[in-house]
Each structure stands twice: as structure tokens, then as C-alpha cells.
UniProtKB/Swiss-Prot annotation:
The complex is composed of six subunits: RnfA, RnfB, RnfC, RnfD, RnfE and RnfG. Binds 3 [4Fe-4S] clusters. One of its GO terms (biological process) is electron transport chain. This is Ion-translocating oxidoreductase complex subunit B. It comes from Serratia proteamaculans (strain 568). NCBIfam families: PRK05113.1, rnfB. PANTHER family: ION-TRANSLOCATING OXIDOREDUCTASE COMPLEX SUBUNIT B (PTHR43560:SF1). One of its GO terms (molecular function) is metal ion binding.
Amino acid sequence: MTALWIAIAALSALGLLFGLVLGYAARRFEVEEDPVAEQVDEILPQSQCGQCGYPGCRPYAEAVANGEMINKCAPGGEQVMLKLAELLNVEPQPLGSEAAAEPVRQVAYIDEANCIGCTKCIQACPVDAIVGATRAMHTVITDLCTGCDLCVAPCPTDCIEMRPVATTTANWKWDMKTIPVQVIHVEQHA
């Protein structure tokens, strides 16, 4: 019986010793995160689409914190670019390409009659906007879809296509540059 208690005590002592060594190593070799990259990463839409040329939002956030252009996030568009410009205290930049300058929001559409239920699109979707079960038809939740286009390529039956979102009163945005409104500041009015 004493051999059992000796084994328990020895294993407990080893566990405590290794825990202390790991705790010390974690504090001694801690890698400090860039706080600017953290803030930039919080602003990005986290769609992990790769349209910016980086494999995900975190690598792009680190690149932006190191001086990369702030206008490469296609899913975030102008809103994200303006937030990044404000955070980094830099001038807003025009969006990356002419197609991105006037983005037409697109969402994935699945032709449910041709869907074989392989779930490859579900696995490819970074924001879980596609629902369905194995060997059953799938559908896209358009409110969640970011239009990243990552679900189209894996589809073996080519039943997924990107379609532009119809402009309605719910998603239409005023072009404030074309409206001739003069802003009157309170100090000038009084």
C-alpha cells in the first residue's frame, strides 16, 4: 500500500514541477500581440475570404498595422476602409479597383433542384451562411452571406452562382454627394 502512495506522491510532484516549468516558460517567452493589429482585426468583417490577397482577416490586419493599404477589404467595402482610416489616423483611400469602387453586393444562390447535398459548400463557407444536410438540398441565408464567392468552386454540380442583391428600401443608401444640402454648424446659426 505504501508503494501506491509513493507512486501517487511522485506523480503529483512531477505534475507540479512540470506545471511550474510550463508556467514560467509561458511568462518568460510570451509573445506580445500588436495592439493596433488587434484593433484592426476587430474592425474587419472576419469573412476570411482572401479577396485582399491575404489568407484571412488576421494576416491582413497585421499587414495593415505594418503600413499596408487599408482599401483591400472587398466584403467590408467603404465602411471598413473609413473605420480603418480613422483608427490609423491616415487619409481614406479609394477602394482597390473600379469594381470595388461601386460594389454591387452579391450573395450566393443555390439551384436547389440540382443540389446533390454533398455539403462541400457548407464546409467552404467561412460565415456559415449555407444550411442543409447530407444528401438533402442546401440553401443560403442571404442576410449572413458576405458574397466572398468561396462556395462556388467546390460545388461538383455547378449549382451555385453569385447573384446581385436587389436594391430595396431596406438596403438602399443615399449618395450624399449628389444631394445639395448645406450643413449649418450650431456656432454659425446662433
